[in-house]
A protein has these predicted regions:
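Short loop/turn segments that flank or connect secondary-structure elements
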Residues: 1-126
Length: 126
């Protein structure tokens, strides 16, 4: 209640507040106990024209801007995401594939295609 829906983290980035050490303030659960974003849910159900911010859609990938117009992408390892990471391993679904929609929305189809090519080359050469 005291910090509001967002705060500035240790990296100086504005981030969404967390409730009880695990849930984003916009978290809701469906009838099966699956964690959902209430903003995205309202948009998908036609109840809001507001689209979830790309920074939220990309999570656990965090974007960082560098001098010279460079954009870095970092994977934010956090224990609350452990069940999703494990499920991804079981399904053989890496984070960048799971986030295809948001990554394409942010960087474009050509960029995402190149990402997949580079990832495949790394897998083949390791």
């Amino acid at each position: 209640d005291k910090q509001g829906v967002a705060y500035t983290d240790r990296d100086g980035e504005l981030v969404t507040s967390i409730v009880n050490g695990k849930d984003c303030v916009f978290t809701c659960y469906d009838g099966n106990g699956c964690c959902l974003c209430s903003l995205e849910r309202a948009h998908r159900n036609g109840k809001s024209s507001f689209v979830k911010p790309i920074s939220c859609a990309l999570y656990p990938i965090r974007e960082k801007q560098f001098p010279g117009g460079l954009t870095g992408l970092n994977y934010d390892r956090w224990s609350v995401c452990k069940p999703a990471v494990e499920k991804g391993r079981q399904l053989g679904l890496p984070v960048y594939r799971f986030l295809q929609g948001p990554l394409t929305r942010r960087f474009g189809e050509e960029w995402y295609r190149e990402l997949c090519e580079v990832a495949q080359a790394i897998v083949e050469n390791c």
